[in-house]
Amino acid sequence: SELPNNLIYTRRIPLGVVALITPWNFPLAIPVWKAAAALVCGNTLVFKPASSTPWCAQLLTEILIEAGIPAGVWNVVYGPGGSLGDALVQHRDVAAISFTGSNEIGGRLYSLGAAHNKKVQCEMGGKNAIILLDDADLDLAATATVQGAFYSSGQRCTATSRAVVMR
């Protein structure tokens, strides 16, 4: 930690098979972010990309194979989100699920995961605020607010949805 008297550490504890269920809007970045953490901890993966971005998933898979990822460490399944996502969460060999997508689907996956004693992490479109303090550079803040809200047409889970401004 950059703060004195604070200790921050990470423990790498493999869980086994981790399912990654990812959205269409960042078809390479989000799977790679999720996979990196799971792989570093010693897990194997089952990657279920969005139905609208199978080609990106296929290219990523080919790159990983060419780079030498061991057989069976990176696995991909293609198909409709509802039935396939539910099947992954309920599968006896899947220990954990990481999902990015809608509130509706994330809520259902949480419930299914709890019923099957799974570790479930869902990112379901946070309500992200930009906070402007009295000493803020207003030009910079205005630019950051607009970019945060409208970059990628607002179709990202980290989009700014409100501004909190001091009086």
Language-model-detected regions and their locations in the chain:
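N-terminal Rossmann NAD(P)-binding subdomain characteristic of aldehyde/semialdehyde dehydrogenases
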Residues: S1-A35, I69
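A structured beta-alpha segment of the ubiquitous adenosine-cofactor-binding alpha/beta core
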Residues: L7-Y9, N75-S98
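Beta-loop-alpha module in the N-terminal Rossmann-like domain of NAD(P)-dependent dehydrogenases
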Residues: V18, N25, P80-A87, G101-R108
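PLP-dependent aminotransferase-like
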Residues: P31-G85
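General beta-strand structural signal in soluble alpha/beta enzymes
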Residues: F47, V76-Y78, F99-G101, V120-E123
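ALDH superfamily catalytic-core signature
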Residues: Q90, A96, E104-R167
